[in-house]
Amino acid sequence: MPQLEPAPWFSMLTVSWLIILLLIMPTIMFYQTQNTVSAQQATKPKQPTWTWPWH
């Protein structure tokens, strides 16, 4: 079975993962979210939640 011979596909697998981890991942991690969440912005809802009657 050709899948069991790692020579043709294992090198492509490792090269593609190295490209993803070393080049693309730092670029993606560089972006920051525009909306920062802080505890001061969090407010409780003004109306209580409606409880469903379970019969």
Swiss-Prot record:
Membrane topology term reads:
Single-pass membrane protein
Entry annotated with the keyword Transport = yes
Q: Where in the cell is it found?
A: Mitochondrion membrane
Which is an annotated Pfam family here?
ATP-synt_8
Please name the InterPro entries in this protein's record.
ATP8_metazoa, ATPase_protein_8
Q: Which BP terms from GO are recorded?
A: proton motive force-driven ATP synthesis
Q: Where are the transmembrane segments?
A: 10-30
Provide a GO CC annotation, any one: proton-transporting ATP synthase complex
Alphabetically list the UniProt keywords.
Answer: ATP synthesis, CF(0), Hydrogen ion transport, Ion transport, Membrane, Mitochondrion, Transmembrane, Transmembrane helix, Transport
Q: Name one GO molecular function term.
A: proton transmembrane transporter activity
Assembly notes: F-type ATPases have 2 components, CF(1) - the catalytic core - and CF(0) - the membrane proton channel.
Q: Which family does it belong to?
A: Belongs to the ATPase protein 8 family.
Q: What does this protein do?
A: Mitochondrial membrane ATP synthase (F(1)F(0) ATP synthase or Complex V) produces ATP from ADP in the presence of a proton gradient across the membrane which is generated by electron transport complexes of the respiratory chain. F-type ATPases consist of two structural domains, F(1) - containing the extramembraneous catalytic core and F(0) - containing the membrane proton channel, linked together by a central stalk and a peripheral stalk. During catalysis, ATP synthesis in the catalytic domain of F(1) is coupled via a rotary mechanism of the central stalk subunits to proton translocation.
Query: Any idea what this protein is called?
Result: ATP synthase protein 8
According to its UniProt entry, this protein's organism is: Lampetra fluviatilis
Q: What is the lineage of its organism?
A: Eukaryota, Metazoa, Chordata, Craniata, Vertebrata
